[in-house]
Structures are given as structure tokens and as C-alpha cells.
């Protein structure tokens, strides 16, 4: 995660503007830096010009243009240390985990508490040996 005193930066990607806004507000209230994109293609573009480290990719799975799984693959190639947290109202966790065993899926709709717990889980898993 970001160093002590520097908040983690999260790239938030969702094609639903309402979900993006809700999620952004919660993350900012928790002290995170948030950059956002409305789809995977835009996220790749944003990440390519963002000079600072991005600690977490928080992405919807089902999106037009570039879906969340392809986005994560691209981001991991460009930024190997990035953590990924998937969100979906459609994808079964078992299907995602079968293909990507290390993945964490946040099922939509979610509460602020569930969102923060999932984000903390991702960062906690980073700190495990």
C-alpha cells in the first residue's frame, strides 16, 4: 500500500455513473486518492498518463469496450505491483475464482461497509508473507 502518511491511490472503473459516484464518495471519505474511468479502454488511457503509483484497480467486470478481466490483465502488465478488486452484479464469484484463484469479488449492490471491508482485505493480503 502507499507509504505511511500517503494515502493509497485507487483507479475506480465502472460504466455506471451512479455506482462510480457512490463508490468514489465512500473511498474519498476513507482517505483514499481516487482516479476514475467509465470503461476499461478509458482506464488504460488514464493509467498510461498517470505518473504516480496506482495501488488498487477497483473495476466492474462487465463493461463495454474492454471488460474488467482484460483491463486487469493489461494493468498488471503495465503496473505489476497493482492490486485488483473486481465488482459485479452479474458474475458468480465461483466462476471468477475458478479462472483467477487470487481474485476478490465485491458483489453489487454493496454497502459502504462492505466496500471498505473488501478494500482493506485486498491491502491486508498484500501485507501477508
What residue spans do the PLM features occupy?
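Active-site residues of response regulator receiver
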Residues: 60
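Receiver (REC) domain active-site loop signature in two-component systems and cognate sites
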Residues: 63
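A Lys-centered signature of the CheY-like receiver
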Residues: 108
Amino acid at each position: 500500500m502507499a507509504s505511511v502518511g500517503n494515502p493509497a491511490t485507487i483507479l475506480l472503473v465502472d460504466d455506471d455513473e451512479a455506482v462510480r459516484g457512490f463508490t468514489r464518495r465512500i473511498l474519498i471519505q476513507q482517505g483514499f486518492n481516487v482516479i476514475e474511468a467509465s470503461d476499461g479502454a478509458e482506464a488504460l488511457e488514464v493509467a498510461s498518463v498517470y505518473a504516480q503509483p496506482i495501488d488498487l484497480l477497483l473495476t466492474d467486470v462487465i463493461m463495454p469496450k474492454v471488460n474488467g478481466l482484460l483491463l486487469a490483465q493489461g494493468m498488471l502488465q503495465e503496473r505489476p505491483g497493482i492490486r485488483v478488486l473486481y465488482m459485479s452484479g452479474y458474475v458468480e464469484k465461483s466462476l471468477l475464482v475458478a479462472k483467477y484463484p487470487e481474485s476478490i469479488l465485491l458483489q453489487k449492490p454493496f454497502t459502504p461497509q462492505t466496500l471498505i471491508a473488501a478494500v482493506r482485505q485486498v491491502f491486508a493480503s498484500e501485507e501477508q508473507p
